[in-house]
């Protein structure tokens, strides 16, 4: 385990150095993301998904699904594509414009267009980034971006051919440059001790862990609300502190002491 960490450390340090150079280049070009202190957000990701589904039901609710029975593979593909294009034309005729922001968790660049996943407080949303839509300079900057960077995106909602609700970006703004390297997407944080000591990373990488903390917070909030309504007083009684103490209990060292300088 230790040898593996040592082997990975130089690579991580090199990536951090590259990211710092990217930040410096942005600052030298007058595009310092840390100068942006406010970004107008109209919707969270869950709201974007909900309003599009409602709008889609309103416009396409009575439209039957495409019938491919009796068609060969090529004909079926053409029929499905034609149906998608018709549905897309109907939806695009009355677009829903949104503005949202979040951390980029995934990016796939494909020439003149790219896809990325943006995670915010309420979930994740795919964004379609096109050079023709946002401009060559903005697209070139986006291609240089890293996983973990925080973006603000303005555009309209649509559904891809694979059925995923996405946002077609018309404007993209880098709000914060991530200098630290997030764990690898598919394996995440494999070190259990690191998960507990660096909860902020665990919450970024694992939505299910975040969901657990959200539920815990709501439960504690309701318990406090219940007791406050009955004039109970909350008294903090820490069970683990930095100094040894407690009657005849034998002092012991913790990870807190072990990692302290």
Language-model segment annotations:
Residues 2-11:
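Extended, domain-scale alpha-helical bundle/helix-rich regions
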Residues 258-261:
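Conserved small/polar residues in nucleotide/adenosyl-binding loops
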Residues 113-133:
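OB-fold (S1/OB) nucleic-acid-binding surfaces
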Residues 97-110:
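Structural detector for short beta-strands of small beta-barrel domains
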Residues 11-97:
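OB-fold nucleic-acid-binding modules
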Residues 10, 14-18, 133-150, 154-230, ...:
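Extended, charge-rich, solvent-exposed interface segments
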Residues 237-254:
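Beta-rich nucleic-acid/ligand-interaction surfaces
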């Amino acid at each position: 385990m230790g040898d593996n960490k040592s082997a990975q450390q130089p690579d991580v340090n090199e990536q951090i150095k590259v990211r710092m150079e990217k930040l410096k280049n942005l600052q030298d070009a007058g595009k310092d993301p840390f100068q942006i202190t406010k970004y107008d957000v109209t919707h969270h990701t869950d709201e974007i998904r909900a309003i599009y589904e409602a709008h889609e039901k309103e416009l396409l609710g009575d439209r039957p699904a495409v019938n491919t029975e009796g068609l060969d593979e090529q004909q079926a593909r053409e029929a499905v594509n034609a149906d998608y294009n018709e549905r897309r034309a109907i939806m695009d005729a009355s677009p829903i414009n949104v503005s949202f922001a979040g951390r980029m968790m995934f990016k796939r660049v494909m020439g003149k267009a790219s896809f990325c996943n943006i995670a915010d407080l309420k979930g994740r949303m795919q964004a379609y980034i096109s050079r023709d839509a946002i401009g060559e300079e903005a697209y070139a900057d986006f291609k240089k971006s890293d996983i973990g960077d925080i973006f603000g995106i303005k555009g309209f909602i649509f559904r891809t051919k694979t059925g995923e609700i996405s946002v077609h970006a018309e404007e993209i703004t880098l709000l914060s440059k991530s200098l630290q390297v997030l764990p690898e997407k598919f394996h995440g944080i494999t070190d259990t001790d690191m998960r507990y000591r660096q909860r902020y990373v665990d919450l970024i990488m694992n939505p299910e862990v975040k969901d657990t903390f959200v539920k815990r917070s709501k439960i504690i909030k309701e318990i406090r609300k219940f007791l406050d309504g009955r004039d109970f007083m909350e008294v903090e009684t820490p069970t683990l502190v930095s100094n040894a103490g407690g009657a005849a209990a034998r002092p012991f060292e913790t990870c807190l002491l072990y990692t302290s300088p």
